Amino acid sequence: MKLSAEGLKDRAKWEEAGYALPKFDREKVTEATKENPFWIHFGAGNIFRAFQANVVQNLLNDGILDRGLIVAEGFDYEIVEKMNHPHDDYTILVTLKADGNIEKTVVGSVVESLTVNTENASDFARLKEIFAKDSLQMVTFTITEKGYSLVNGKGELLSDVEADFVSGPEAPKSYIGKVAALLYARYQAGEKPVAMVSMDNCSHNGDKLYAAIHTFAEKWEENKLTDAGFRAYVNCKEKVTFPWTMIDKITPRPDASVEELLKKDGIEELDPVITSKNTYVAPFVNAEECEYLVIEDAFPNGRPELEKGGLMFTERETVDKVEKMKVCTCLNPLHTALAVFGCLLGYEKISDEMKDEELKKLVETIGYKEGLPVVVNPGVLDPKEFIDTVLQVRVPNPFMPDTPQRIATDTSQKLAIRFGETIKAYAASDELDVKDLKLIPLVFAGWLRYLMGVDDSGKAFDLSPDPLLTTVCPYVADLKLEEGQDVESAVSEVLKMKQIFGVDLYEAGLAELVCGYLKEMTKAPGAVRETLKKYV
């Protein structure tokens, strides 16, 4: 059994092995899509293959759509060359359910794949042709938050971007430069309307995409490299929009145990490829069953009925509320709490932590008792139900190979938004008292204990990458697992850092509590567990 148009001709064999196959006429859909494309997506990675492509497949199966997707890859061309083309753009989606069941789907809704490479003349000409089509309604992106940045870590323009500003839209080298050049082709074809939709997992993502594209339009116009009206076109909401979205679905890298499962079914040529850009890609993707995509409904050229595939369309303010609900209360804070204590207690899978009574109670209390009273309720999703799903379905899912070590990455950048907003909301409330927060301060103390790089049994471990490690680790460098230390003197400066906690913990009235917890957790090996038992 081979994953290709030829290999899928023997449908009975695939169906016998438990695979759901496309139910539509793919040749007909391919022809219609190439002639009148409505949706092109940039970023041929796992999230797109597991989420957007599957939504479109379901709508094609139900006869709601008659055209599929075109995908373009601009960061790593080998994904298209080594994965899409050899498999005729088919993907196997393995949905790993919390109840132990596995769903296997052959996704065939992607019918054309291209590289966003100006040196590949035929691909780039085809992209320009797609962008000039009246039928094009939406251009979507999963290129990571970094993909929208025109500067490096020091704030200096990236060299490709700088070169593109002066060479213009003919043959740009930078990713956003190429996208801007394609949008310029649409402008030249008659200022045709389109929605440019970032679907990356970052706050106000549409603004990030707009800022990057607008900068190119501005520079090119200043340097007289485009027609004078291009910038006005990018700025005209009746013609080009940059909707905000909130996406949530975990798609870990292809897992070896899933690969074995598919091999047992008799599927050949499943080997993952590690590209020269270090992308780990396979003919299959594995993902959790839960998925959320909330989109600001701003589509100047119309859009298909994607809500019939489970996507939610609403106004910008609601997208923002959903984002805040997830990031500040209902998912991300719970992940961080489990990450910090998971590393300290020697866990290697997040799902295993939900079998730990103290840790389970810790996140339940942070979510339901401390977070929910101040949650931003978006209306389109119920916050309590969202937490229910996180704690009962998503995090305990044994098939999701997520680790506390991965989630602990960059914790210093996450605490302010994930916990600081709740503290501020308590401080601003007439009914609530910051001093009622008992377990959020415990997570802060847990993080400081984590920075010692010694687990609860006294064994050293590697800290996950974090840009502030060199800043904060020296404060805990002299702490040991023994009684009688002056913990507060060691960490008082850190507790004042608003950029880490979102507030000065002394001003908020929580510093004493954090120091007390940290003192208890550094008494001896085993003290982290004892502290959890005592306070959770």
In which residue ranges do the predicted regions lie?
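Substrate/ligand-engaging "lid" and interaction regions
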Residues: M1-F42, N46-V536
